[in-house]
Amino acid sequence: MRPDSLSAQIFSLATVAIMISSSYLLYIEDAEETDYDMRVPVWARNQQPFDTTQAYSFVLQQGPYSLLQTDNEFDSVHVMIPYNLPESEGGAAADPQCVLNFDPDKCPHISLAYWRPDVPQGMKVPVIAEIGPYFGEESAGTPDITQPGGWLGVSVLYNLLPHGFAFAQVSVSGTGLSNHCMDLMGFSEQEGINAAVEWLGTQEWSNGNVGLIGKSYDGSTPWQAAMYGDKHLKTIVPISGLIGVRELMWKNGSSEARAPFMHNVVYGSYGFSSEKGDENLQNACQDYLLSTLHSTNAYVFAGNEFIESYWTERYFLDRVLNNYRGSVYIVQGFHDWNVDPHMAVPTINTLLDHGIEAKVLMGQWDHDYPDRPDYQKDRSDPGRGSEAYPEMVRFDWMQDLLEWFTYYLQEKGPKPSLYLEIQNNHGEWRVEERYPATDSKVVEFGLGGNLTLVEEGGFGTIVYPGMEAVDDWIVFETETFDYDFRFGGLPQLHLQVTPQGSGGSIYAYMEDCPADGDCDELGIHVGHAIMDLRYHEGGSDYQYIVPGDTITAKMEFFAMDVLIPEGHYIRLSLRDIGEDYLPSSNEAAVNIELGEDSVLRLHEINFKNKIFFEPPVCMQEDCLEE
């Protein structure tokens, strides 16, 4: 028997191994006799009747509409959307059968599946869409695009579609059933994304408003779409999304281990399918074939290339600021190991400075959604989020999305509060207007002064190649704090250094240490920074280094929000590299010059003027075990 209700439809997904818990599938809550038209401030949501016992979050009230049935067992509709590319892009654009009009199906097409609510005749609805490379992708082992993804799609269908939203899933070029090349966020992919947005906004059943949401790669496609400034794109919700590809893989010139291989190795098999036949040949695009060369050259030159087109094509934020007129809701984890938080901070302030309505939700999780207690627990370690669990779990998140999309896509209801919601590493949530905050107090610690040198490395205060291999450090410590010291944002470490060669790199590791215990055993990570000295001025400008000349390395830590408890102190340790970063391509020993010009700069939070709040309390079994 065909499913004839939304709950039954979602239950049917379990039979085809959609990855979602049975408790979530079976959860049905009757609508409360409560007026939820008035927005409840975030600091009062813990008084609302959220179900906090499940593996996902839910809206407070089920919507009135069911899922519109189709002849597909998942009640979806699948279409292929044509779009134009210049022949210079290669792939499908240069396929002779396309160029000579022998077979239009060989021309560039984007694969799209959508679901609609069963609404009264004539009622038009907005569309929430997720765009990425993972739908029906053979190499990733993911379900067909006509099935809602268990990572997000099922939750959207259950919680948001009944409130009058359509939902769509879209495969980027060269993945799933979309032909052409896997372009890794390049021009071809961007054009296909824009074509999908335009198509969704112009259907007769659409009200013309489109919102994009997704995590990781799927959180980067919203930024790509926003570059075009399409009138139909009203809001984006990037979750751990990229503002640029090079920005993902290089920080201050230092290269992540995956950087030289990202395009061809990590995503190299995407787009190839046993069912595509000769369409597999369409992956022969210039950027795809040359991407390893670009990445290798960029590694040699610390993220810089003399031919910049590959990377500038894949940087989004500048064009978003120039063209986009919608809103942005950023979701980011402070401990995201995949997409570092510098994608969100200071991006959020940049958006606000350009008049874009924006908010950010930043908790102490890693590469995850904010409402997944089981994943968050499994992926949290000491100094990497566990001290903020289970307070990090946001069971009000789906309600937050409903209120956001209702205003920006349905154009009704009160405007959501554009609070920046920030969680520190001990679990405290607070509201900020900007982040980093503008009312912070700068506190400086001079290396060799109130940041005391307590341990030299094997060569004194010289950072040298190979320190990581022998676990050697240069260690500094502050005095013990006599109060709870809260700081956050983007701490800075400005070091006077003298490279003994034409390059070199420095890695800084910051810890919270108890005064009454061994920091090596009891200290926890609070943050880190990395720099290739060819970028010692900070930013993206390549610098030439003269061996023996003293320079200032203007290092910036990844975003952090930290509470150092009373009776604890800060330890700062230096060596050549750390985390998952590669050694510099021109390694050299670097002497750290102590004195007033070498400074750790922290931004103390003015906590007395902040609103702190507790989110709905997690009662799911993983939380209760804490």
Language model: regions and residue ranges:
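Secretory targeting signatures
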Residues: M1-E33
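Alpha/beta-hydrolase fold nucleophile elbow
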Residues: E204-S216
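Accessory cap/linker subdomain of secreted extracellular hydrolases
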Residues: Y36-D71, P82-Y83, G91, E137, ...
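A short loop-to-beta-strand scaffold at the N-terminal edge of the catalytic core in hydrolase folds
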Residues: E87-C98, D105-D118, V127
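Cap/lid segment of the alpha/beta-hydrolase catalytic domain
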Residues: Q121-G201, P373-A388, P514-A515, E579
